[in-house]
Amino acid sequence: MRRTQQGTTASPPVLDLGALGQDFAADPYPTYARLRAEGPAHRVRTPEGDEVWLVVGYDRARAVLADPRFSKDWRNSTTPLTEAEAALNHNMLESDPPRHTRLRKLVAREFTMRRVELLRPRVQEIVDGLVDAMLAAPDGRADLMESLAWPLPITVISELLGVPEPDRAAFRVWTDAFVFPDDPAQAQTAMAEMSGYLSRLIDSKRGQDGEDLLSALVRTSDEDGSRLTSEELLGMAHILLVAGHETTVNLIANGMYALLSHPDQLAALRADMTLLDGAVEEMLRYEGPVESATYRFPVEPVDLDGTVIPAGDTVLVVLADAHRTPERFPDPHRFDIRRDTAGHLAFGHGIHFCIGAPLARLEARIAVRALLERCPDLALDVSPGELVWYPNPMIRGLKALPIRWRRGREAGRRTG
């Protein structure tokens, strides 16, 4: 998506992140650290060609995430949305209060820790089936993205929302096209196709007694449009599906990459699985699935330590750098599953804190436990330097994660 600002006055120099290539995609942390040393806010050009502001450093990141002067509503942006984007942006993630409050309240109860815990048996069943299929590979090798990291969260969120099984593969194509775009036109086409599909899915649920979340939202909209308009219904379906799986895909894959790249930490976790919850939190901090929080737009000029961000400009808060700020996380480049990660921002901060965090954590914990318990000597099947990272400044994700394990009597046994 093009996010070049319109109508701003003289701007500071622009750092072209795209020119840094795969080196930056694979390891953006030194660049972010250099920027942080120079100040909290910087103009950059993303690999897509968008000119935006990056906010770096833990304290500034946390403050901006909770600052009401930074709007999430595109009506406060100087950059117009395309028709395809506008059709899908009527959702809680891209709204400010009171609209945000109203929309979030409609779905919040479905994602409480108590409600999510009720999904544990089904999530375990899905994980067991996927790991069974993966371990059936005759050569003891697989791409973890394809075998587990992607199919688990798309299955869980699709069942929760009532997306038919035959339709789910299309979401991989659509989300890859606009989350990791190679071609802007292709991204717009994907958004239009997803919008059309979701509109048809919503229509198919009208007048039915479905027990899924999307059916419940359809009934709410039909009964009282003041609580949920038809445009908001479409936007909510979109954000729940995309945010409901994309983050968890990369949490599982990035987390397992971090674990497999640090044999001492892998051994420590295998020896004491009570460390699992803390390990997942360290995965979120060390190599989290969200590199930068989604777009924000100042409603007035905002001065960050002497750098003024004009009203309407696009701002990305770099969570990845917040988590590598040594004043907040000592020795931040060390992966340590016993670390105190309290205060990490992987799921955001403030009113837009990720509503699906309990579900993402549940899926990741079950997936990691299953892999370690059922694959005796799970390992990367390539060197870390051979892995390819997507050049997206918001989503931190791998194109593939090749793994291998020992074939033998011990491999593959379910322990639960």
Curated annotation (Swiss-Prot):
Substrate binds at residues 94, 187-191, 238-246. Keywords: Antibiotic biosynthesis, Heme, Iron, Metal-binding, Monooxygenase, Oxidoreductase. Its cofactor is heme. CDD domains: CYP107-like. It is an enzyme of class 1 (oxidoreductase). SUPFAM superfamilies: Cytochrome P450 (SSF48264). Pathway: Antibiotic biosynthesis. Disruption phenotype: Abolishes the production of methymycin, neomethymycin and pikromycin and leads to the accumulation of their precursors. It catalyses: narbomycin + 2 reduced [2Fe-2S]-[ferredoxin] + O2 + 2 H(+) = pikromycin + 2 oxidized [2Fe-2S]-[ferredoxin] + H2O; narbomycin + 2 reduced [2Fe-2S]-[ferredoxin] + O2 + 2 H(+) = neopikromycin + 2 oxidized [2Fe-2S]-[ferredoxin] + H2O; narbomycin + 4 reduced [2Fe-2S]-[ferredoxin] + 2 O2 + 4 H(+) = novapikromycin + 4 oxidized [2Fe-2S]-[ferredoxin] + 2 H2O; 10-deoxymethymycin + 2 reduced [2Fe-2S]-[ferredoxin] + O2 + 2 H(+) = methymycin + 2 oxidized [2Fe-2S]-[ferredoxin] + H2O. Its EC number is 1.14.15.33. It comes from the Bacteria. Heme binds at residue 354. One of its GO terms (biological process) is macrolide biosynthetic process. One of its GO terms (molecular function) is oxidoreductase activity, acting on paired donors, with incorporation or reduction of molecular oxygen. InterPro entries: Cyt_P450, Cyt_P450_B, Cyt_P450_CS, Cyt_P450_sf. Belongs to the cytochrome P450 family. Catalyzes the hydroxylation of narbomycin to give rise to pikromycin, and of 10-deoxymethymycin (YC-17) to give rise to methymycin and neomethymycin during macrolide antibiotic biosynthesis. In addition, produces low amounts of neopicromycin, novapikromycin and novamethymycin. Requires the participation of a ferredoxin and a ferredoxin reductase for the transfer of electrons from NADPH to the monooxygenase. This is Cytochrome P450 monooxygenase PikC. It comes from Streptomyces venezuelae.
